[in-house]
Amino acid sequence: RQKAFAPVFASFRKILGDQIYSLAQEPEDTQQGKLLSDMFLPETVWQIYVVERSGDAVGFVSIRIDSDSKVGEIGLNAVHPDYSGQGIGTEMYKFASDKMKSSGMQVATVATGSDPGHEPARRAYEKSGFNVQIPSVWMCQVL
């Protein structure tokens, strides 16, 4: 997880600066590790799928199926940096979309950042068919 998300955390730190990052974002980054661990608990609503190459885990994607709303969601996901640029992300997201569709979902969603650290993920989401966006901005102020 640390290697896969390192570019994102570095991007956030560069954008926010050390003070805001350490107070406002770093706790969220740390909490992400707990969220990922919780996704493996028996009572989780998340389904986790792992991509392997030659027996090594090189990526993972989590999905949530909401049968009531008919909206599926891609949650935490990552590709090991040593395997980036090989189409693994696009493959994972197409798989996730197919899984959601076969489960009766009518819409698939994913949230991502617009920072440089998320650029590879955004490209892969777009290549796999995610083509409608809501622009969003997260703003901070030092007090």
Give each language-model segment a name.
Residues 88, 105, 130:
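Short phosphate-binding/catalytic loops that engage adenosine nucleotides
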Residues 3, 34-35, 91, 95, ...:
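Alpha-helical elements of Rossmann-like donor-binding domains used by nucleotide-donor carbohydrate transfer enzymes
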Residues 84, 109-121, 140-143:
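Conserved beta-strand-loop-alpha-helix junction that forms the acyl-donor binding cleft
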Residues 125-135:
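Conserved acetyl-CoA-binding loop of GNAT-fold acetyltransferases
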Residues 100-114, 136:
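Conserved GNAT acetyl-CoA-binding A-motif
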Residues 79, 85-98, 123, 127:
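Conserved acetyl-CoA-binding loop-helix of GNAT-fold acetyltransferases
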Residues 2-75, 80, 99, 133:
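Acetyl-CoA-dependent GNAT
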